[in-house]
Every structure is written in C-alpha cells, then in structure tokens.
Amino acid sequence: VIYMTKLLLLVLFILIPLTSNAISLNELRNNPTKYKLVYSDSSGDQYVDNDTINVIRYAPPYYVISSTSYLVSYEYNVLSELHNTYFYDYNNNISTLLEKTRSEQEFGSQVTQYAGIKYITNKITIFNYNGKVYQGPILRNESAKIPKILSPAYESAMYSFYKSYNTYFNIPSKIQKF
C-alpha cells in the first residue's frame, strides 16, 4: 500500500506540470488584463499573454521580442498556444519605407514584401476549448517568416512591440485592437 501511494504521488507530481499550462477559451475571454485580444475575424481570434512578453534584444534599429499568443480557430474548434520570437528592423518599417520610396506603387510593393517584421514560432500546443491538450507540444526549428500585414502573427508582433516600448513599430491600422 505504501509503495502504491508513493507511486501515485510520483505520477501526480510528474503530470501536474504538464496540465498546469493548459488554457481554456473561457480563461482567454474572461481575463482581458492578462490576455489581450489583438486580432479577430470570422474564423478566429488571437490573444497575446501580457505576462510572457520579453525583450530579448534592444539594439536600435534592431529589436527582438518573444511572447506567447493564443490563436482560437472557430473553424476547427481548437486553440493553439504559440511561443513566438519576433525580429524587428526599424530601417524597414512603414514610416521609413514611406520616406525611401518614390511612388505609391513602389511603396505598396515594398510594404507587402517586408514591413520590418519577421517571426519564428518555436513551439505549438493545441488545446480543445476546455483546455485539454489535443496535440503537442510540438517544437519547431524553422527559419524566420515575414507575416502578412494585418495577419494574426503581424498583430501579435505589433502588440508585443507596443507593450514593450509604449510606441508603435508601424503605423496603427483602423482595425487594430490596441
């Protein structure tokens, strides 16, 4: 009996850390000071966990910030926890590109190609809406990607920069939620 009790306690101590990071849709929605809604459309929402925003590099014009975001998919009835690292280059932000380019067409072309932000998703865990792990965690090893302007990844990068420095990296859009 003592052996079984010790074994049960050992299993519980091992499993508690695995479930402590679980998050539910209600927790995201009911804690707006901890989880900031940064993106929303008909198929999903994206939140950034304010407690996870961490400046890794401050070397103007270059900045690196990490944060955790939660992408809610209403299409697939899951939410994904995304551990991201964002790379910022102020020499290529929208304001700088406005000054550098000679025409609207050139500006539009450059902004859609690269507006000074890249990101890497380091780890993904997928949950159901009640917080039960559906898949993961999945560790990723990929090169940095350029997010599309106004995409969930772009808005999370913009918010992480804003929250870190109390200034916008790029000019805020009309649909921006912060």
Describe each region flagged by the PLM.
Residues 1-3:
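Short, Lys/Arg-enriched N-terminal segments with co-localized hydrophobic residues
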Residues 7-16:
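Sec-dependent N-terminal signal peptides
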